[in-house]
Amino acid sequence: MEEHSSIVFPLEFKELMRLKKEIDKNPEKWEEVKRVINPLEFASCDIAVAKVQPISRAFFKMIELSEKLNPLPETPVRTLHLAEAPGGFVQAWNWIRKPLGLTDETTAISLEKTTFDITWKRLLEVSRFWFSRPTLQTGDLMKKETRDTIIEEYTREKIKAWLITGDGGFDFSEDYQNQETKALPLILSQMLIGLRCLDKGGCMILKIFDCFTLPTIQILWVFCKVFGEFRIVKPDTSRVCNAEKYIIAKDFKGVDKNLDIFLTKIDGIINEYEKDASFHIETLFDTGPISKWDTIDEHFKTSFEISIKRFINTQINWIQKGIDMMNSDKIIENTKIKTANVVKWCRKYHIPINREYFESHRLCHVNRAEEASSLSYHSLRQSQSQSQNQNHRIFYQKPVLKSDQQEPTPPAFLLRHRSFDDS
């Protein structure tokens, strides 16, 4: 088993790798424990607190992430969702846009699982009654032919996407230690397609994992340079023990000469990996200040170190808690506290409450006002947009870190735009 090294946070990296080795000793038991200690696990289960029936947990993540995109366009837009199956992000986007009466042109692409119908089975069922159904496609984003076909479609028509999401990942349950290096080629593929197909002023959401290696840090640097606003968040509904985080980038500046050269190089790197899966990606830049950690600009490094270190420490604390529970052979779940967590989350994001859950668990039910449907969703989102706009103005006055979530989730990583060739 190949183990990667860290160029930042050596102590935290060593501790996290130690804990992940403990997890690898008993992955089956860990699968149970990680769900038990997750504060918002009850949002999505057989009988869930939330009344919405999501295709996957990604639905709830996208509900949270979309709040960071406010204000949303009040006219139909084009959206592209990469590595999307089974379709949670698309379902959430439809949920968000439906009250506005807008019919966006939505396309979802994912790796085919046996057949097209199996890959998109749940989204095909859910979207049957949507006014505007998404265009569903299959394809391997790691193959140049697939990438070129997608990019050609968006560049040929001159109608690029306002929103692009990349939620790709793998089953890391057999090897938690090498998430970052294994996920890197897919992350690069999604970034390449996204930046080629995104319209000026558009937004991108991209899932990443650990941030210990130079290529991952360089990806963050690129997003910082080519977007007007950039942050990293971990949604509350993302399981606390995993490493997944999301880049949320707004106000895309477009593809200039420097970015075009960079994306062409990334295409070549992915092609090399496709030929030889053992190909090790050491850097995305051969020259310039960004080619080495020591020469990256201090503003970026400071913001990165403060924010990412908090993500890591939070993850370490939760994993240690899970391992302690796993070793004690006493897997205890506090249903009432976890239910209260989910109810609070549903209130925050205006998700209706499921009465059946409270009845089946013999818990006190919330009042009927809290189980109301999304009829007032539009007005609620408008009021929240105004509030968030005020926060954005404050951010531009002082472009440092901003806390998007309460503990135990660390603050988001926010940076203001600088030009791509600005070191």
Regions found by a protein language model. Give the residues of each.
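Conserved Class I SAM-dependent methyltransferase catalytic core
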Residues: Q177-I232
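Beta-strand cores of modular interaction/reader domains in eukaryotic scaffold and signaling proteins
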Residues: R78-A83, T107-A108, T165, C203-K207, ...
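Intrinsically disordered, low-complexity glycine/charged-rich regulatory or linker segments
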Residues: M1-R156, I281-S423
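Gly-rich Lys/Arg/Thr-decorated short loops/hinges at beta-loop-alpha junctions or inter-strand turns
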Residues: A43-D46, G166-Q179
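Class I S-adenosyl-L-methionine
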Residues: Q218-Y273
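A short acidic (Asp/Glu
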Residues: G88-N94, D117-W120, D175-Q177, L214-L220, ...
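Conserved beta-strand elements of beta-rich interaction domains across eukaryotes
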Residues: E84-F89, L111-T114, G169-D171, D210-C211, ...
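Active-site cores of enzymes that catalyze phosphoryl transfer or operate on phosphate-rich substrates
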Residues: R147-S173
